[in-house]
């Protein structure tokens, strides 16, 4: 059931509700009054993000914020999973402009403040990295389709190309030019029907807050049925194209990384199995689900395709 507009919870009230549940009983028992509890809630700085909370119909248990924000791939900063937390302080997510162009009738340049005005909702999604680890994250954002509908794709548009900001003053690896870990700027792409799918999200926040720098602030893509490298971070450009974009990892190694990158336990990476994954915080591995558990929703997009060839 889709929440009503009246169900939209301002971020500060959302936080207060969670804080009340966590602190209320203990505070009342310890002090015999609610005054200390109310004082504690007032110390929480309000956020401008308002969003529809997730109904979490799958009863997914999110990883902790510390796990999801402290273990990331962001090669513009480092190949280390933990170093971007500190190194990403050079990123300036505000002000920010998104240039949307290409095969559209209504090209636009949108500020991050304008993007915050889209109806935001919380989506609790599984996230599966091609490297074999996974997590569950409560993202905040809006369907990419909402932006694309505003742009009005032409009949020539078949793909959507995404590009990370190119600014060596903010991203250390971009200073290295041809010696960088990857060619810059980072590029990803989707077929137009994939981009228009209701699960495809442009995320501006997570865990009730704006995106941390190391998680791709201020704007990133989330495609939950694909491996994580498709979910490009710090997006500066969106372009609708006639031709399939050459995404960064396919450019680097087309034998190991394809354009589609659908999560598929039946198609191994050339150097490791994709049949299982390690959930962050767990010592044991779990079976990987086809399309990361979203097979019912997205399998029809690939009807008749050879998923071992088109990986």
UniProtKB/Swiss-Prot annotation:
Catalytic reaction(s) noted: L-methionyl-[protein] + a quinone + H2O = L-methionyl-(S)-S-oxide-[protein] + a quinol; L-methionyl-[protein] + a quinone + H2O = L-methionyl-(R)-S-oxide-[protein] + a quinol
Presence of the UniProt keyword Oxidoreductase in the record: yes
Keywords: Metal-binding, Molybdenum, Oxidoreductase, Periplasm, Signal
Lyase found in the keyword field: no
InterPro entries noted in UniProt: MsrP, OxRdtase_Mopterin-bd_dom, OxRdtase_Mopterin-bd_sf
Quaternary organization: Heterodimer of a catalytic subunit (MsrP) and a heme-binding subunit (MsrQ).
Protein name, UniProt field: Protein-methionine-sulfoxide reductase catalytic subunit MsrP
Species name: Wolinella succinogenes (strain ATCC 29543 / DSM 1740 / CCUG 13145 / JCM 31913 / LMG 7466 / NCTC 11488 / FDC 602W) (Vibrio succinogenes)
């Amino acid at each position: 059931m889709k929440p009503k507009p009246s169900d939209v919870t301002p971020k500060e009230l959302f936080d207060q509700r969670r804080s009340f549940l966590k602190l209320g009983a203990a505070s009342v028992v310890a002090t015999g009054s609610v005054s200390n509890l109310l004082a504690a809630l007032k110390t929480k700085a309000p956020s401008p993000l308002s969003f529809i909370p997730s109904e979490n119909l799958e009863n997914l248990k999110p990883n902790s914020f510390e796990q999801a924000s402290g273990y990331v791939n962001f090669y513009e900063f480092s190949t280390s999973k933990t170093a971007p937390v500190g190194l990403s302080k050079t990123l300036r997510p505000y002000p920010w402009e998104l240039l949307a162009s290409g095969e559209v009738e209504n090209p636009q340049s949108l500020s991050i403040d304008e993007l915050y005005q889209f109806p935001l909702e919380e989506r609790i999604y599984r996230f599966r990295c091609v490297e074999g680890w996974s997590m569950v994250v409560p993202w905040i954002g809006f369907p990419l389709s909402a932006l694309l509908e505003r742009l009005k794709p032409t009949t020539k548009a078949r793909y959507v190309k995404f590009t990370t900001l190119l600014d060596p003053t903010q991203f250390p690896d971009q200073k290295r030019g041809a010696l960088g870990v990857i060619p810059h700027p980072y590029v990803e792409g989707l077929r137009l029907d994939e981009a228009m799918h209701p699960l495809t999200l442009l995320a501006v926040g997570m865990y009730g807050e704006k995106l941390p720098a190391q998680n791709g602030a201020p704007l990133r893509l989330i495609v939950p049925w694909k491996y994580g490298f498709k979910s490009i971070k710090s997006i500066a450009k969106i372009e609708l194209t006639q031709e399939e974009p050459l995404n960064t990892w396919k450019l680097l190694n087309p034998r190991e990384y394809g354009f589609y990158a659908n999560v598929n336990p039946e198609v191994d990476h050339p150097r490791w199995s994709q049949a299982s994954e390690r959930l962050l915080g767990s010592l044991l591995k779990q079976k990987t689900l086809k399309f990361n558990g979203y097979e019912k929703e997205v399998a029809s997009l690939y009807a008749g395709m050879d998923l071992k060839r088109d990986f």
